[in-house]
Amino acid sequence: MHALWSRGAIFSSTSIKRYNSRMRFPRLLLLIVLASPAWAGVVENVREALASNSFTAADIYLKSYRDKNGVTPEYIEAYSWMARTALNDRDYDQAQAYAKQTESLALEQIKQHPLDSEPHLAIGLGAAIEVESQTLAAKGQHEQAIAVLRTALHAYGDTSIRARLQKNLNLLSFDGKPAPALHADQFLGSKPPALAQLKGTPVLLFFWAHWCGDCKAEAPIITKLRTEYASKGLTVVGPTRLYGYTAQVENAAPADELAYIDAVRKRFYGGLLDMPVPISKYNFDTYGASTTPTLVLLDRAGKVAMYHPGALPYDELKAEIEKVVAR
C-alpha cells in the first residue's frame, strides 16, 4: 500500500482520506494548533486531538514539535498514541505501522541512553510492543503475537516495562495455566497462604496499589462478593507492592511507604482488613499487573480461570465467580 510521510507520521493514502473525513478543520483551528507552545506538552496535545477523533491535528502537533525539538523521548510517547488510537479504531494495518515506527524511534534513543533513564521512552516503547502484539492477535496471528512478547521480555525483562509486557502475554496465554506462586516474605493483614494450599477452593487475586482510585472503588464490590460466596469457599488475596513514594513524600523509604500502605488499607479497605496482602514487585511482574486493579480468578484446581487488567463492575465479576464455583 502506498504510504504518505509527514515528519514523524506514516499514513496510507486511504487512511488519510478516512481520518480527514472525521473532522474538517477550519483555518483558525489549524493556526491555533501550529501556534501551540512546546511547553504545553506534546503528549497532552496529541492525546487531546485524538480524543476529538482528529489524526490530522495530532499529526500537526507532532510535526511542529519535531521541527523544533527533534525526536525526543516525549515525542516518542506522543507518537505511540497514534498507534494506540488506531488500534482502538480497529485500523490494524495503520496501528501496526505506527507501532513499528514508534519502536524504531525508541531503539535509536536506547543506543544513546538506557531505556529507564527517561519515563517517556519506556512508556512509548512499551506501548509500541503492546500495540504490535494486540494487532497481530486481532488479525488472528496468535502465535506471532506471543513470539513478539516473548522476544521483548527477553530483551527488556529487567526494565520498568516488564510487567506491561507480561500483562499482554498473559492476556494471550494465561487462561487455564497453573497460577504462579506468590512471594509473601513481606505482608500486611493475615499471613498469606501458599496458593498450592488453597487448591480445592476458588481464589480471587486482587492486585492493588496505594495510589489507585479504581482499586478503592473496587474494594466494596470484592467485599460484597466475598461475603456472598463465603459458603463456596471463595478466598481473596490482595497483592500490592512498594512504588518508592507516598502521597506526601516523593522518595519514601521502604519502611515509611509500608506504613503508608497500611494506613491506606485501614482507611479505604475496611471490609477486607483480614485479606492477606503479600508485598512484592515480583508478584506484579509475574502476573503482569501493570494495570491496577488487576483481577485474577483461580479455579479449584489452582488454574487461571479469568485474567482481567482493570476494574470490573459487580455483575460482571459475580458472573465470572459463578462460573468457577459451579464447576
Regions found by a protein language model. Give the residues of each.
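Structural microenvironment flanking redox-active thiols in thiol-disulfide oxidoreductases
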Residues: 217-268, 276-285
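Thiol/disulfide oxidoreductase modules built on the thioredoxin-like
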Residues: 267-322
